[in-house]
């Protein structure tokens, strides 16, 4: 009987991860406000603006492109609290990747929970910002959202 060969180590790509030097993030809410108990869809966009021909790799899942909702300095909700599968994309000159991220209008904790089990946020003004996990400087401009 032959031995089963050991698996080979995964090779690391020579293509760099995307960061603030080669991508621009933008975040567009579907509306400027919504009611308590409602939800808000955001269009998250990452556009390659680097000069390298090889481009860069970015995880466009909700764990890699993180939507953060804040009230002042208080973090109210983050899209990466619950685990999701990664979705790495190679982007290069002229490429733009868009996806929809939905904030269920609730306050999340540090552990994954169903949105139905979490408290609705109160009326008020919140800020939303998109960032790339592991690259603190790679983020969109914050946008204001009103919960009525």
Task: Describe the function of each predicted region.
Residues 124-130:
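A short tyrosine-centered beta-strand micro-motif
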Residues 13-15, 117-123:
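N-terminal helix-cap/turn-to-beta initiation motif at the start of protein domains
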Residues 1-92, 131-132, 136-148:
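Primarily secretory-pathway and cell-envelope proteins
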Residues 37, 123-124:
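Beta-strand-connecting loops/turns
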């Amino acid at each position: 009987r032959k031995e089963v060969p050991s698996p080979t180590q995964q090779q690391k790509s020579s293509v760099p991860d995307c960061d603030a030097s080669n991508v621009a993030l933008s975040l567009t809410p579907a509306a400027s406000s919504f009611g308590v108990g409602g939800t808000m869809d955001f269009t998250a966009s990452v556009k390659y603006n680097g000069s390298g021909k090889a481009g860069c790799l970015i995880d466009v899942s909700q764990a890699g492109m993180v939507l953060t909702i804040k009230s002042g300095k208080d973090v109210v909700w983050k899209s990466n609290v619950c685990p999701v599968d990664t979705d790495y994309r190679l982007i290069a000159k002229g490429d733009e990747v868009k996806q929809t991220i939905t904030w269920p209008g609730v306050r999340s904790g540090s552990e994954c929970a169903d949105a139905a089990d979490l408290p609705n946020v109160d009326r008020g003004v919140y800020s939303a910002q998109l960032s790339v996990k592991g690259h603190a400087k790679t983020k969109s401009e914050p946008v204001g959202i009103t919960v009525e």
